[in-house]
């Protein structure tokens, strides 16, 4: 996209907003005729033709054949130009980073998975993220001017509108993390919560898209426990961007201190860290597991250990996971009673167990939810696995770049 077009769509003028609206229409519908655009904008055909011409000249859209219907002259179809711009998505995990690139049409062209990383709340750890993004740009011979936005998914409480992170990398309270990243990397940057990124990935390219649903709850069962909400085709952020704190609803009288500072949070009994604690305690209590040697050597269990043990059908780990599934299902039943979604997606590291966790969640949901509400809700395991966060980050980068300021 040309600098002039980018400047146009950034303006609050009617002309600029019309162009931005056309871009968003094509993001949602892939193609459109001139008549479609005229109707969408409530403008005349000549005005629509002028807008489409300027978008074409700006490198944003292109002709994509003709709509072959009826008789007479077939109308030209317009769609986004894949070479009109690129978007980088960054998914930050506890022990690695995934980085990917999509073009304007949403096609993924580069994916770098499993870049070693240690997530710590330090300036040094933040600098590593910046360095890896710059290395990705260099490695794939990308030009900074062609990158229209970068979106970084980060765990914790994030306000994507202001660009502030409230748990990690908040070293400069008066400066949004997004602006710090943008200054360091040299291009526009947005940030969002990791679970919302995963939810958006499944919504745009995964399970929700495959099933054609418009409302979905994404439950992220990983080291922590999070929730992403897609309501009527839109991410629900809440007033300050803090929606989805499922792991921190007060459920238990267990006196276990959560990292949020409260006691009795759902995450203290249902999460990867809770599973590590429970498995280690039961092994030390005399129960057998494939993880017994490591625990007795004094090693701390990691998520990868639990996932590997479940894949090997370790009875102790599967028993703990099934108990967690039943407890989580009870809380998901409450969410279904409140939101009545079309779909509940069970994702995250611990969901990749051949549907084992999902089965126990579903059994519990059927027990604790109202059947008249649940009967139209599907519960499915996420289809994208570890790719969900990266795909969501890429798609969020594109969505954020073209957000409309007024409807």
Features from the language model and the residues they span:
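ATP-binding/phosphotransfer module of carbohydrate and carboxylate kinases, centering on a glycine-rich
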Residues: 1-64, 69-72, 77-113, 117-145, ...
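General beta-strand structural signal in soluble alpha/beta enzymes
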Residues: 63-65, 189-193, 229
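Short glycine-aspartate micro-motif
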Residues: 87-91, 147-151, 216-220, 226-228
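Short, acidic, Ser/Thr-enriched surface-loop or helix-capping motifs
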Residues: 103, 160, 230
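Hydrophobic "anchor" residues
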Residues: 108, 165, 235-236
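Glycine-rich phosphate-binding loop and adjoining helix at the ATP-binding site
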Residues: 111-215, 356-367
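Active-site glycine-centered loops adjacent to acidic/histidine catalytic or metal-binding residues
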Residues: 194, 222, 393
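Glycine-rich phosphate-binding loop of actin/hexokinase-like ATP-binding domains
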Residues: 207, 212-270
């Amino acid at each position: 996209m040309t600098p002039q077009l980018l400047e146009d769509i950034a303006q609050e003028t009617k002309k600029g907003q019309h162009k931005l609206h056309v871009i968003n229409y094509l993001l949602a519908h892939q193609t459109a005729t001139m008549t479609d655009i005229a109707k969408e904008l409530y403008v005349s055909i000549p005005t629509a033709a002028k807008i489409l011409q300027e978008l074409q000249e700006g490198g944003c859209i292109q002709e994509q054949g003709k709509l072959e219907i009826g008789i007479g002259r077939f109308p030209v179809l317009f769609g986004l130009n894949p070479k009109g711009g690129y978007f980088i998505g960054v998914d930050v995990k506890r022990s690695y980073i995934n980085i990917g690139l999509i073009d304007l049409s949403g096609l993924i062209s580069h994916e770098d998975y499993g870049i070693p990383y240690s997530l710590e709340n330090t300036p040094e750890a933040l600098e590593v993220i910046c360095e890896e993004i710059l290395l990705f740009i260099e490695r794939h011979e990308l030009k900074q001017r062609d990158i229209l936005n970068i979106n970084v998914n980060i765990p914790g409480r994030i306000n994507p509108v202001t660009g502030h992170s409230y748990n990690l990398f908040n070293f400069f309270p008066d400066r949004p993390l997004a602006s710090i990243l943008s200054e360091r990397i040299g291009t526009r940057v947005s940030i969002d919560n990791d679970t919302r990124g995963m939810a958006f990935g499944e919504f745009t390219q995964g399970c929700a898209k495959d099933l054609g649903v418009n409302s979905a709850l994404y439950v992220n069962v990983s080291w922590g426990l999070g929730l992403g909400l897609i309501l009527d085709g839109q991410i629900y952020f809440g007033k300050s961007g803090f929606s989805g704190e499922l792991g921190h609803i007060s459920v238990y009288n267990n006196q276990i201190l959560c990292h949020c500072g409260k006691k009795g949070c759902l995450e203290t009994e249902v999460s990867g860290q809770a599973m590590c604690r429970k498995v280690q305690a039961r092994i030390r209590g005399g129960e057998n597991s494939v993880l017994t040697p490591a625990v007795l050597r004094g090693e701390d269990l990691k998520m990868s250990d639990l996932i590997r043990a479940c894949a090997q059908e370790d009875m102790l780990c599967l028993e703990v996971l099934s108990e967690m599934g039943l407890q989580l299902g009870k809380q998901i039943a409450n969410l279904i009673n409140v939101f009545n979604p079309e779909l509940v997606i069970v994702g995250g590291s611990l969901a990749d167990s051949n549907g084992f966790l999902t089965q126990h969640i579903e059994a519990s949901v059927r027990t604790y939810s109202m059947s008249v509400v649940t009967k139209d809700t599907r519960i499915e395991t996420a289809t994208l696995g570890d790719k969900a966060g990266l795909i969501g980050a890429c798609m969020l980068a594109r969505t954020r770049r073209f957000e409309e300021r007024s409807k």
